[in-house]
Each structure stands twice: as structure tokens, then as C-alpha cells.
């Protein structure tokens, strides 16, 4: 299990002594008194690492404010001190960046780690499951509530079932372990009623599951209005209370913002924290479009439809341009990735759609730049991305350029190489929907009041609250009328 033999204490051949040693190392990394719940988790983790079958899956379901982040950071440090390699993964680039920030170690997206591009890929599948060459490593996956066991991209990635592929990849190594970390109060994967990666019953198909849960808010966070209200909403969900969420506002890190104050407050947060650390979270793409339009026009002073410096969000996975860019740090552009528009080269009208050639910079990938075609039609669309009908129309129009190719297979391959057909679908990223915000963390979060108008809004409200960084005592989590 140990990567560094010199780190193995000679007297710790006994698993029970090894368990004690690991627990001691974890406690040493935590600079405050642990809660009873944290102590139980530390004991369970230590036992899992020292005594359990490596094929067992460990689940840590941690409520907001319970010290889950601190615990994982301590675990990562303890593993390194014990000579055990931690491998940190998250579903999205933004979530990986958050994980890396609090753990102090590099983190990758799951897709970047477990899949590799096929050198002779056919037109239907481009990425196969990579080979896990690790020995005795511990894979820690944060934001596991986002993990689906199906894909809208079919079998472009491995089997098309991300959770299956993740488990298979980890077990493909020698004596590697898998720890899934998340919060089941957050939104499940799109189209799912629950989060399979945090559900012991769903995970039992893979074998032994060790399920643990943190539910005691740590003393340091007791005065956080963000966490108080997140806990309040969680209690509503757990007890089946179907009512409109009502936030308590008498805390220093949360306030109500009247409609007439919104633009001024937003500008203040842009000045204080930066645009990439400030977000508006709302329910629908229609509402997000309205906010993005107003923010660009009245706060940022934008005059054009799209301008250099705009923040954009990728709204549909895209594989075309990363494959054709040398040394690109991203396997693909993921739905939810945020980029700054550095340069606009030209606008084009083709196939009944509008495009632009752009250079995008991705902060979550060390400001890596990528030149690509972007599709402008999705910016103001009220659908999450191109509708099925629009996608079919684009395909049919592009196909007309290749009708001289008689073979349908060859023609389809040529269409898939067309940069306009593969244009990156984007929206503005100043205001986003709850699903798009999941896994991210910002220093200033504005919550649209529409998230508290219906009795079924509790889970959406919880997700919006989780987007605010409770460790930042200056965080503003606002709602506006």
C-alpha cells in the first residue's frame, strides 16, 4: 500500500497499529478540536485504509459546514506523510480547482484522468478507458453527487457510464482505493432522481460499501448565515417539508438586496472580488439571459452583442478543437467550463446560423488559451443549448456541402470534421442556472428570488447557497427583488 517504503514505521506491520498511525497523522493536520462526528469519520477512514479490502468503496456524505473540506485536506496531508499517494479528482474543471485550492494538491477532472483519446478512433467513439498504473494509491473524488451513470454523449467516453468506468479504472490498478465525497442535498445528475455515487444501495452492485455521514456543524461555522440557511433547507428536504424556503437574513455574510440596489451591489462585488469570483444564480435559462443582458449593458457598459473580455460558459461538451490543439491541457471542453473571451477574429453567417472565430482563456486550466469557432445563436436562446431540431437543421445544412461523397459513412466523417458543425456552444457566464453552478464556489453569490417562490425550490435554494464560499467572511449571498 505504501508508495514510499521508508515512510513505513517498522513496528506497524500490524494493521491495528497502522490504523492508529494513520488516524494520528490525520488529527495532526487539523488545527482545532474535532467534533464527535469528525472523530468517527477519522476512525472509519483509518480502518478503511489499514484493514479493509481495497476494492471496498468509501463514501463520505458531508453536510454544508460540517468540516468535510477540512477533513479531506487533512486526509490528503496524512496520506502523503504516510507515503501513500492521493489522487484528487472532480467532475468539472471548476470543482477540481476548488478541490486543489483547499487540499493544496493538484486535482484533475475525472475525464482527464481516466480516459484517453483513441489513436484510431472511429466516428462514434473517441475516448477509451485508460490504464491505471498506480499501485496502492487512494483516489478521492469530490462533488460526487454530480456523477451520473449514463451520458448524453452516449459512448464517446468509455462505456458511456461514468460511475461504472470510474470504479473499473480505480480497480484496474494494484490495491488502489476509492473515496467518494459529496453532499446528497445537492442536485442529482440531470435526468436523475438521486445521486448514485452517494447512494449505498446503488453502489452495492460494485461490492462492499462503507458509508459515513457528517451532519454536525462545526463551531467555527456556527455564525455563518450561509450555512445556517443551507442547514435549514437541508432539514426541510430530509423531513419532506414541501414549503417555500424562507431564509434568515440577520447574519453578517447574507443580506437582502432590493432591486434598485442590485446593479450597485454587483459592481461593488466585481470591484472587490473580481468577475470570476462573483455569480448570479437563477432557475431558468430565460432568467439567466435577462440578467446577463442587464449586467453587460448597465454594469459592464458593453455595447456590442459580444466583446473581448466577456465571460462565457460552455453549454455543451465539445471535443473538436482541443483534439486539434497541440499540448492542450483539456481533453475536451466540458459543459459548464467558464472562459474569458480574449480575442474575436471574425463573424460569419453559414448554414442559417451565426458564428465567430474566438480565442478563449480558461482560468480553471491555468489560463490555457484555445482558438475555436463559437456558435452565437445559443447565447440568447432560452434552451440550455441547441435544441434537437436546431442540431438536426445544422447537420442537414452542412451535409449539403458533402453530397458528392456517396458513402454515408465517409460523408458523416467529413461532416464531423467541419469546424462550423463543431462550433462551441456558449452563453454568457455572469448569471447561470443552478445546474450550471453546481460544483463551483464563488466569493460573492447573488441568489435570484425566483428560487424561493415555489414549494419545490428547496433543493435549488440549497445548491445556490452552497455556491457561496463560507470560509470567506466577506461573502455576500444575496437575493434581490
Language-model regions, residue ranges each:
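Conserved SAM-binding loop
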Residues: 34, 88, 280
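Short, conserved phosphate/pyrophosphate- and ester-handling motifs at nucleotide-, phospho-/glycolipid
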Residues: 38, 92, 284, 439
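Catalytic phosphate/metal-binding cores of nucleic-acid and nucleotide-processing enzymes, i.e., regions
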Residues: 55, 93, 346, 427, ...
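Short, solvent-exposed amphipathic alpha-helical segments in soluble enzyme
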Residues: 104, 295-299, 462-466
